[in-house]
């Protein structure tokens, strides 16, 4: 009688060859579920071995989901899950009453006598649940494709499907348990030994800028780095310089260590790929962007441009200029790039142009979702993520224009989620807009101040979770949007560092 009460869920699948509807039973193993539950009721300690990966929704039978959930709750209360305690918890449940629950629990215990390794049964149940989820995703993809409005692009649906499949593939893989401290110490010692052998002590990805590396020790895997600044400070230009430097430095290191070459990903949500590439060419060939756009080039400059273009073309540098991407789309594309091109570092220009997944009217909540998503990408893909950010207009209302953490737009969540927060600030930009009249007595004083900050960009490290904060100064050539070490004798071509 009890067995007849257990349901079999059936899917109707259409055969494309003859248009016949063929009923197919969803994959499950009722007996494995019964034997595992019986074994846990008999020996509650077994729950600890399967609860790390097995949840109640992984069971196919609804009554088995209820029994497993009840077992977990009883044990969490410090009690023993027995037929008696389970009965007291489930006695009011309609399904438990329908299948004559007390008799059914006795049957489960009887069946458990044949169990040799309960963990194997748990893995069977888990694997079948994943297959059912895969079927559900497939049905959802088909239904969405049939029912989607013209406003929903096919590419967006593909990314949604890919994200669902990727999440399903990783289900259970990220559920880490405790690590014995000896293992963690061994990993730490390995990192320390590696750093000791490195003469410049840059243990992350080198930025190519000496003073910045001395502060940050390079960009580190799983870190979220926020680079913020007011308009015209040069944050996009700085990001392009960093992307180019890290791309070249990763390549050299990978070749030296005989490893697969890592790539740079650059999400340009504001600037087109062509505009970004023009900046790269201007930077490397040292030809101003205006000359490149107008085509007013001498033969010598054009030959130099072709040479740098050929060098750039060989780099593992990838640009995505799709506007208004959602955080889920960025995650999906970054995952894809990790699989296909061994993504080593990711740049995003800029944070406020990313759409959240949930439709929140509260921008602070949406930014929180985005920054948490970016940090999750950094951890999941084990790469540094550098996201550019705007600053509030409050900076312009102060006499001292140097930015502070409180100037970050929707600052609370950005500051909280970031491992490093850097500001770019150029005093030269503000001074040039305050030039006194030529004959004015203050003009000489103004000129002296301007000379001290000419071609200098300050990088203010306002937050550094694992290191010192402070300011550094960099050389900045606005004509070519080029950053380098402050002492010009150490300022070489980006591609030749």
From Swiss-Prot:
GO terms for biological process: DNA replication, synthesis of primer. Its EC number is 5.6.2.3. ATP binds at residues 229-236. Homohexamer. Residues 198-490 form the SF4 helicase domain. This is Replicative DNA helicase DnaB. Belongs to the helicase family. DnaB subfamily. InterPro entries: DNA_heli_DnaB-like_N_sf, DNA_helicase_DnaB, DNA_helicase_DnaB-like_C, DNA_helicase_DnaB-like_N, DNA_helicase_N/primase_C, P-loop_NTPase. It comes from the Bacteria. SUPFAM superfamilies: N-terminal domain of DnaB helicase, P-loop containing nucleoside triphosphate hydrolases. Keywords: ATP-binding, DNA replication, DNA-binding, Helicase, Hydrolase, Isomerase, Nucleotide-binding, Primosome. It comes from Rickettsia typhi (strain ATCC VR-144 / Wilmington). GO terms for cellular component: cytosol; primosome complex.
């Amino acid at each position: 009688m009890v067995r007849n009460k257990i349901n079999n869920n059936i899917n109707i699948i259409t055969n494309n060859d003859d248009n016949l509807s063929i009923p197919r039973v969803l994959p499950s193993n009722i007996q494995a579920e019964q034997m595992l539950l019986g074994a846990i009721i008999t020996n509650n300690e077994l729950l600890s071995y399967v609860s790390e990966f097995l949840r109640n929704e992984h069971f196919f039978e609804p009554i088995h989901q209820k029994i497993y959930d009840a077992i977990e709750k009883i044990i969490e209360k410090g009690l023993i899950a027995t037929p008696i305690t389970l009965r007291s918890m489930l006695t009011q449940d309609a399904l438990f009453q329908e299948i004559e629950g007390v008799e059914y629990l006795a049957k489960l215990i009887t069946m458990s006598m044949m169990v040799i390794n309960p963990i194997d049964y748990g893995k069977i149940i888990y694997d079948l649940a994943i297959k059912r989820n895969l079927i559900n995703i497939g049905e959802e993809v088909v239904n969405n494709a049939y029912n989607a409005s013209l406003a929903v692009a096919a590419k967006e649906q593909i990314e949604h499907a890919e994200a669902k499949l990727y999440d399903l593939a990783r289900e259970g893989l990220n559920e880490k348990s405790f690590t014995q401290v000896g293992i963690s110490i061994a990993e730490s010692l390995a990192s320390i030994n590696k750093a000791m052998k490195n003469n410049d002590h840059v243990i992350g990805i080198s930025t190519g800028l000496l003073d910045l590396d001395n502060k940050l020790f390079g960009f580190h895997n799983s870190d979220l780095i926020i680079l913020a600044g007011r308009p015209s400070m040069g944050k996009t230009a700085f990001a392009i310089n960093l992307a180019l430097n890290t791309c070249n430095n990763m390549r050299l290191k990978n070749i030296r260590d005989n490893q697969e070459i890592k790539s740079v990903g650059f999400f340009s949500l504001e600037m087109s790929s062509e505009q970004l590439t023009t900046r790269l060419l201007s930077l490397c060939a040292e030809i101003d962007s205006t000359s490149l756009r107008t085509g007013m080039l001498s033969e010598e400059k054009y030959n130099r441009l072709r040479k740098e273009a050929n060098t750039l073309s060989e780099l593992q540098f990838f640009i995505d200029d799709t506007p208004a991407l959602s955080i889920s789309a960025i995650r999906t594309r970054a995952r894809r790039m990790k699989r296909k091109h061994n993504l080593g570092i990711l740049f995003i220009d800029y944070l406020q142009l990313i759409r959240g997944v949930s439709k929140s009217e509260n921008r602070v909540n949406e930014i929180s979702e985005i920054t948490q998503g970016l940090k999750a990408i950094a951890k999941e893909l084990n790469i540094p993520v550098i996201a550019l950010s705007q600053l509030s207009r409050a900076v312009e209302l102060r006499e001292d224009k140097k930015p502070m953490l409180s100037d970050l737009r929707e600052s609370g969540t950005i500051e909280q989620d970031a491992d490093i927060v850097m500001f770019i600030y150029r005093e030269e930009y503000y001074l040039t807009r305050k030039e006194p009249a030529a004959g004015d007595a203050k003009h000489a004083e103004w000129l002296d101040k301007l000379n001290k900050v000419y071609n200098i960009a300050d990088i203010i490290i306002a937050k550094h979770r694992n290191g010192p904060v402070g300011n550094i100064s960099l050389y900045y050539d606005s004509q070519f949007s080029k950053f380098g070490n402050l002492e010009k004798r150490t300022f070489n071509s980006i591609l030749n560092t």
